[in-house]
Swiss-Prot record:
Residue numbers of N-acetylmethionine PTMs: 1
Residues annotated as catalytic: 290, 458, 478
Protein name, entry field: Calpain-7
Record-linked SMART domains: calpain_III, CysPc, MIT
Family (UniProt): Belongs to the peptidase C2 family.
């Protein structure tokens, strides 16, 4: 953070606050006083040497408190008339026409200029306001002159050479989907594929195209991947834009007080997209999206602290400086990271209000500022409406930013948690700007929540992390913008606060008692005790290289549970070139979700398991033991971290796993690495397959070779193979039985060489599944005897042969 820049921000906000205060524009004054105070707080954190900085902070916050009553009592200015709004739309049409004009998009520019002229003339004929008529006619004249100037070269033969160099309107072309961040849209870092790639990034396989096409339809609406062509999206229209899909479904709580849908110009005289990006100004209402609002808050805080576009870069239209701007025509486009790629979401600006005219969605404390409400609306549209089932910040922040999600459970039996190591890591990474953080409470009784000032299963934004003389603190924001922690170091704690600590944390309990904005300090120990999960979102720019694969796992492939066999699980080879000093490789598994019910009742428990098997396929879950085992969680995102310390080539097998496979899933595996690597699906060398359906029944359930009298009664099959080649044999039986098989050579064609054998087995008997893989089996005739470990274990089985040459099979017994 730059202390000088923050000091300048504070001066600018204070000047605007005083100006609005003198003009009687109290709502805007309140907003800017708060922003001035926040800028000073951040400036002090960054090492500002300004004198009496805490006094100034208190002064601004006290003025905020004093103005609240004035805001309530002051009558609002009359809203703009329809004809004044038409003039604003005409101005926007001309502005957009001028942008197309500058780019040389002649036909687009002419169309927009013409529509502006028609709107000006129509409105001028409807209004009796002479001043307004003059403005409309003047604007119409300017637009008409430019439209005619552009049209003239297109109609004169002697200007054909000149006009040939001018761009004419071409239909936008949407090619294959981008695999990662679009190089035309954002420039954080180059995402270069270690696989085959072209000049613009990674190529798609036919399977990937089908996966992304299938999961483009979310809750019945298609959200296409965001492409460079979408930067030419049209936003200017003579009439207010209305989403063709209609209004969003409201939540039950909204319906109880809902009055109507309004546009920003129905609420304020001066709608603006963004006055200033601030986490302090964001307020959640009755939509159950606390994690989403917390995600907005920390994204805004990050953008403010590090002066890097994060949340403001996802909403369009934007001006030439890349700043989102208010559109009087009411159309907006938001880029969200959904189901493997950034996707395009179109919304109008209609928002729900109650009978008092108060918004029933999240909003900025500056009622003229729109970005909070519009980004929330875009996300709610994708999720099927404001009747949002709830989420977590990992999911929401990934959708908003594309940053890498990680989950730290503080009270989990399956995940170890180190309080000291976690704080040290969070402190260092937070202040470097590497990570966004939220914290969520777990289930608690109403009495517990009331006692501690906490909301059960609620997400809080982490705004700051500090350490002072061995004491460790986290600053949190409740998305409700009220209701704070009541335990140690709350504003009412008279025992633990010292003048020294207050100065270090820029916190005055007496001032805080005057206004509840939902922001508070809590000790790290108390957070670990009373909160349940910390959600992290990591900046992908930390990694030099990244690539991904989009794929599908069919529910019909393999057993419901993979506790005994991984033969049908998707598997990938990851080969990493680790430099001196070590490196980190992260693998993110993301399941695509296309239905609100699936989102609300996520029953798919996914994980990623890592094996050190040189990139070869793994068949048994515990043989060899996993290098990194996965915890199966019902979240759409699962992050695996591989830490390398030894220089050289490291090769891993990555296995996608589920707890109980109920449905076909579509997913993306994305690898982030600080060093070069290759990543690909493990190919099958086999081109032919044959299955035998058999059963152990009565006498033929003879058991293993330990039971000599009955073993000879087991089914016996014979197979003929004409050429030497690789062979994979798999036996699948009832899970409650341990199964195995033997292969016995009957006759070998020619010299078998080193690959000849008399007898081979599948090894130890295993529950429900076993296999034998031979790199080169000589041509010849072989018998195979499948059996259960114990006699009299009856049931069906499948015997699968996978090869590169035809195999003939017969049953001998």
């Amino acid at each position: 953070m730059d202390a000088s820049a923050l000091e300048r921000d504070a001066v600018q906000f204070a000047r605007l606050a005083v100006q609005r205060d003198h003009e009687g524009r109290y709502s805007e004054a309140v907003f800017y006083y708060k922003e001035a105070a926040q800028a000073l707080i951040y400036a002090e954190m960054a090492g500002s040497s300004l004198e009496r900085i805490q006094e100034k902070i208190n002064e601004y916050l006290e003025r905020v408190q004093a103005l609240h009553s004035a805001v309530q009592s002051k009558s609002t200015d009359p809203l703009k008339s329809k004809h004044q709004l038409d003039l604003e739309r005409a101005h926007f049409l001309v502005t957009q026409a001028f942008d197309e004009d500058e780019k040389g998009n002649v036909e687009d520019a002419i169309e927009l200029y013409t529509e502006a002229v028609e709107l000006c003339l129509k409105t001028s004929s409807e209004t009796a306001d002479k001043t307004l008529q003059n403005k409309l006619k003047q604007l119409a004249r300017q637009a008409l002159d430019r439209a005619e100037a552009l049209s003239e070269p297109l109609t004169k033969p002697f200007c054909k050479l000149k006009s040939a160099n001018m761009k004419t309107k071409t239909p936008p072309v949407r090619t294959h989907f981008p695999l990662g961040p679009n190089p035309f849209v954002e420039k954080p870092q180059a995402f270069i594929s270690p696989q085959s790639c072209d000049a613009q990034g990674q190529k798609y396989t036919a399977e990937e195209i089908e996966v992304l096409r299938t999961t483009s339809k979310i809750n019945g609406v298609e959200y296409v991947p965001f492409m460079s062509v979408d930067l030419r999206e049209r936003f200017a229209y003579p009439m207010p834009f209305c989403d063709r899909l209609g209004k969003l479904p409201l939540s039950p709580k909204q319906k109880t007080t809902f009055s109507k849908w309004v546009r920003p110009e129905d609420l304020t005289n001066n709608p603006t997209m963004i006055y200033t990006v601030s986490s302090f100004s964001i307020k959640q209402t009755i939509v159950s999206d606390c994690s989403f609002v917390a995600s907005l808050a920390i994204s805004a805080a990050y953008e403010r602290r590090f002066n890097k576009k994060l949340i403001t870069s996802i909403i369009y239209p934007q001006n030439k400086d890349g700043e989102p701007e208010y559109n009087p025509c009411g159309k907006y486009m938001v880029k969200l990271h959904l189901n493997g790629v950034p996707r395009k979401v179109i919304i109008d600006d209609q928002l729900p209000v109650d009978h008092k005219g108060e918004l029933l969605c999240s909003y900025s404390n500056n009622k003229s500022e729109l970005w909070v409400s519009l980004i929330e609306k875009a996300y709610m549209k994708v999720m099927g409406g404001y009747d949002f089932p709830g989420s977590n910040s990992n999911i929401d922040l990934h959708a908003l930013t594309g940053w890498i999600p990680e989950r730290i459970a503080m009270h989990s039996d399956s995940q170890t948690f180190s309080k000291d190591n976690s704080f040290r890591m969070l402190y260092q990474r937070f202040h470097k700007g590497d990570v966004l953080i939220t914290a969520s409470t777990g289930v608690m009784t109403e009495a517990e929540g009331e006692k501690w000032g906490l909301v059960p299963t609620h997400a809080y934004a982490v705004l700051d992390i500090r350490e002072f003389k061995g004491l460790r603190f986290i600053q949190l924001k409740n998305p409700w913008s009220h209701l704070r922690w009541k335990g140690r170091y709350s504003e009412n704690d008279v025992k633990n606060w010292t003048p020294e600590l207050q100065k270090y944390l820029n916190f005055d309990p007496r001032t805080a008692q005057k206004i509840d904005n939902g922001i508070f300090w809590i000790s790290w120990d108390d957070l670990c005790q009373y909160y349940d999960v910390v959600y992290l979102s990591w900046n992908p720019a930390l990694f030099k290289e990244s690539t991904c694969i989009h794929s599908t796992w069919d529910a019909k492939q393999g057993p419901v549970k993979d506790a005994y066999s991984l033969a049908n699980n998707p598997q990938y080879k990851l080969e990493v070139q680790c430099p001196q000093g070590g490196a980190a490789v992260w693998v993110l598994l993301s399941r695509h979700i296309t239905d609100k019910d699936d989102f609300a009742n996520n029953r798919e428990f996914i994980t990623m398991v890592v094996y050190k098997t040189d990139g070869k396929k793994v068949y048994y879950p515990a043989d060899p033991p996993p290098y990194i085992d996965g915890i199966r969680i019902n979240s759409p995102h699962y992050l695996t971290k591989i830490k390398l310390t030894t220089p050289g080539t490291h090769t891993f097998t990555l296995v996608v796993s589920q707890y109980e496979k109920q449905n076909t899933i579509h997913y993306t595996v994305r690898v982030y690495s600080a060093c070069s690597f290759t990543f690909s699906k493990i190919p099958s060398p086999y081109t032919l397959s044959k299955r035998i359906n058999g059963k152990w029944s009565g006498q033929s359930a003879g058991g293993c070779g330990n039971f000599q009298e009955t073993h000879k009664n087991n089914p016996i099959y014979q197979f003929h193979i004409d050429k030497t080649g690789p062979l994979l044999i798999e036996l699948r039986g009832p899970r409650q039985y341990s199964v195995g098989f033997e292969v016995v050579a009957v006759s070998i064609m020619g010299d078998p060489g080193p690959h000849g054998f008399q007898r081979k087995s599948s090894g130890d008997y295993r529950c429900g599944f076993c296999y034998l893989e031979l790199e080169n089996i000589p041509a010849g005739i072989f018998n195979i005897i499948p059996s259960t470990f114990l006699p009299k274990q009856e049931g069906p089985f499948f015997l699968d042969f996978n090869s590169t040459v035809p195999i003939k099979t017969t049953q001998l017994q």
